[in-house]
Amino acid sequence: MLKVCKFFLLTLSVSCLFSSCTKTAPQLPANKGNVVDKNISNLMEVNQKLAAKEDSILMAFATKTDAKFKKSEIGFWYKVDVPTNGELIKDKEVCKLSCTSLSLEMKVIQTETMQIVIGKKQLVVGLEEGLKLLHKGESATFIIPWYLAYGRNGKGSRIKPYTSIIYQIKLF
């Protein structure tokens, strides 16, 4: 019985020793979340103001360029240059297209022919959503605001941050 009591006391003291030596995990200060939330809120407000300013610039540009431009629900402008009676483009569909990208000053940035799968995010968001409005064989012009194109990062030396882009598209 004495051996059992000694063993029990030894086990209890060893377990107390090990449990008291563990470090508690560091905790964030209670007000840390408020600072982060405020910064995010400020960034969102700045981005909304920039987007609103860009929208007014693009509206003026679109209406001055051609009265046929329409504004989409998500914020890009488009017009169908050559309409067809083909089928509407759908998600997961393979499309071959000719694409010329231009600055708002009408300087050519890039011209290429490519094959893409709709919905695979191979193009900027605004252009991919715009293609879903077209029928096979159509040609169209899109004015994509920076926040639906390459955003605040741009694309290398060719497309600077916060740059809106015009795309002239021909679907095959």
Report the location of each language-model feature.
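Cross-family detector of peptidyl-prolyl cis-trans isomerase
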Residues: L2-K6, C21-F172
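C-terminal motif of bacterial Sec signal peptides marking the signal peptidase cleavage site
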Residues: C16-S20
